[in-house]
């Protein structure tokens, strides 16, 4: 293996959405260096933090249509049965909701919790209250996807927070997504809600750390044997 290959395999990829921010931090750091050199080094540290924030590592996603995979890195902040947002059109029956809260240090790339076809994308303007609060799922700015899976329709909702005020979603209606496939990003702290129909059993508890594209949040059916994973 060459030195270049070693470096490439060691460094964590940065998502393209972060390039502009990293460039701005870097240029400002150089400019501050003309005023006072220590400011330049502080700026370089902040530039490195910005690159770390927009990191986009590969993940090993379990291959199983019965598993619901975490759509983001973070902490499980809620496991409850609630009504889904009206704009998703998921009906009038309560659904299992599992929420993953992302702080500013988590990787903020969002991934599909299950494989399927995107049936609806619904954006709703709103407030920017703390995304950890339960009311954030109804009051905050959000963008929801409805995905048709073999177990029926599920919802995954990107929710803005106090700092995060830019929700990005680059998939489209009628698109096919694989479990663990990247579909969006929320800048600087936020939350993802996953809404699941009857038959889904949670496999996580509140306070548990979740890894996007890898951690199993819930499962349809009984537990099975070893699961094969693929790189995503």
Swiss-Prot record:
Task: Provide the assembly information.
Answer: Heterodimer of a large membrane-associated beta subunit and a small pyruvoyl-containing alpha subunit.
Biological process (GO) annotations held by this record are: phosphatidylethanolamine biosynthetic process
* NCBIfam families according to UniProt: PRK05305.1-1, PRK05305.1-2, PRK05305.1-3, PRK05305.2-5
Q: Which family does it belong to?
A: Belongs to the phosphatidylserine decarboxylase family. PSD-A subfamily.
Role summary: Catalyzes the formation of phosphatidylethanolamine (PtdEtn) from phosphatidylserine (PtdSer). Important for establishment of root nodule symbiosis with the host plant.
Q: What is this protein called?
A: Phosphatidylserine decarboxylase proenzyme
- Gene for this chain: psd
The record gives the membrane topology as: Peripheral membrane protein
The record's statement on gene disruption is: Initiates nodule formation in the alfalfa host plant much later than the wild-type and forms 90% fewer nodules. The nodules are almost devoid of bacteria and are unable to fix nitrogen.
Lineage of producing organism: Bacteria, Pseudomonadati, Pseudomonadota, Alphaproteobacteria, Hyphomicrobiales
GO MF entries? phosphatidylserine decarboxylase activity
> Which pathway does the protein contribute to?
Phospholipid metabolism; phosphatidylethanolamine biosynthesis; phosphatidylethanolamine from CDP-diacylglycerol: step 2/2
Modification sites for Pyruvic acid (Ser): 190
> Could you list the residue ranges that cross the membrane?
none
Alphabetic keyword roster = Cell membrane, Decarboxylase, Lipid biosynthesis, Lipid metabolism, Lyase, Membrane, Phospholipid biosynthesis, Phospholipid metabolism, Pyruvate, Zymogen
Q: Which cofactor does it need?
A: pyruvate
Protein modification: Is synthesized initially as an inactive proenzyme. Formation of the active enzyme involves a self-maturation process in which the active site pyruvoyl group is generated from an internal serine residue via an autocatalytic post-translational modification. Two non-identical subunits are generated from the proenzyme in this reaction, and the pyruvate is formed at the N-terminus of the alpha chain, which is derived from the carboxyl end of the proenzyme.
Top-level taxon of the source organism: Bacteria
Query: EC number(s) of the enzyme?
Result: 4.1.1.65
User: Any idea where this protein resides?
Assistant: Cell membrane
Question: Active site at which residues?
Answer: 190 (schiff-base intermediate with substrate)
Protein source organism? Rhizobium meliloti (strain 1021) (Ensifer meliloti)
Recorded hits in HAMAP family, A to Z, give: PS_decarb_PSD_A
Which PANTHER family is this protein grouped with? ARCHAETIDYLSERINE DECARBOXYLASE PROENZYME-RELATED
Q: What class of enzyme is it?
A: lyase
């Amino acid at each position: 293996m060459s030195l270049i290959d070693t470096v490439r395999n060691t460094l964590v990829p940065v998502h393209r959405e972060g390039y502009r921010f990293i460039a701005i931090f870097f240029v400002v750091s150089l400019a501050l260096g003309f005023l006072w050199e220590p400011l330049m080094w502080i700026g370089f540290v902040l530039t490195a933090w910005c690159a770390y924030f927009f990191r986009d590592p590969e993940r090993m996603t379990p291959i199983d249509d019965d598993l619901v995979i975490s759509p983001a890195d973070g902490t499980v902040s809620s496991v409850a049965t609630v009504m889904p947002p009206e704009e998703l059109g998921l009906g009038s029956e309560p659904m299992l909701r599992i929420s993953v809260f992302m702080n500013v240090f988590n990787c903020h790339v969002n991934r599909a919790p299950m494989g399927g076809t995107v049936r609806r994308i619904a954006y709703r303007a709103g407030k920017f209250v703390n995304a950890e609060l339960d009311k954030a799922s109804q009051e905050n700015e959000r963008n929801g996807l409805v995905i048709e899976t073999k177990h029926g329709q599920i919802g995954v909702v990107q929710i803005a927070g106090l700092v995060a005020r830019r929700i990005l979603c680059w998939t489209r209606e009628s698109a096919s997504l694989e479990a663990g496939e990247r579909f969006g990003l929320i800048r600087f702290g936020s939350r993802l809600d996953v809404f699941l129909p009857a038959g889904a059993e949670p496999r996580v508890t509140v306070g548990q750390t979740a890894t996007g594209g890898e951690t199993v949040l819930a499962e349809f059916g009984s537990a099975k044997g070893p699961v094969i994973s693929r790189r995503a």
